[in-house]
């Protein structure tokens, strides 16, 4: 009977081992790689890279930056003659000498866009001021002053070519020449 017990024990153990899949054998070969997983979140930002090499030099051009043209002049103490360029009595700035000081005529030496401005203070007179460009009026302003001093201003931007001329003409009318006073400032500069 003891043999039967041993035999039954062996059979029961064998069944238990077989139900669990049998005995563990040696490991098999590695399997094939699986599909890629889900993309993870981005990592932290890295440090900046080194500077790149210098680029190739650009084309050379002549810069007109050094070319300038500007003036400011003043007339005071006398009344200007009509239909003639105003002869200014004081030069406040004319470093490039583009305004001919004895005639009051500006001659363009550097082509480009110019701002021209004039301011007139008047008393006891009527004044008409014209900004002239090569004998054509491009801006005209009028003002009348009886007892109170008045002022008159004008500004215009003109594109000019080399050799073109610009000046002011002023016509002054008054019944009291001894009391009439006119002061004119005229400026121009290349933009």
From Swiss-Prot:
Ranges where the Collagen-like domain occurs: 22-58
Signal sequence interval, chain numbering: 1-16
InterPro entries: C1q_dom, Collagen/C1q_domain, Tumour_necrosis_fac-like_dom
Domain C1q: 64-191
Keywords: Collagen, Secreted, Signal
SMART domains membership: C1Q
Pfam families according to UniProt: C1q
One Gene Ontology CC term in the entry: extracellular region
Source species, domain of life: Eukaryota
Chief localisation class: secreted
Subcellular location: Secreted
Region entry Disordered, spans: 22-61
Residue ranges with Pro residues bias: 26-39
Protein name as annotated: Protein HP-20 homolog
Protein species of origin: Bos taurus (Bovine)
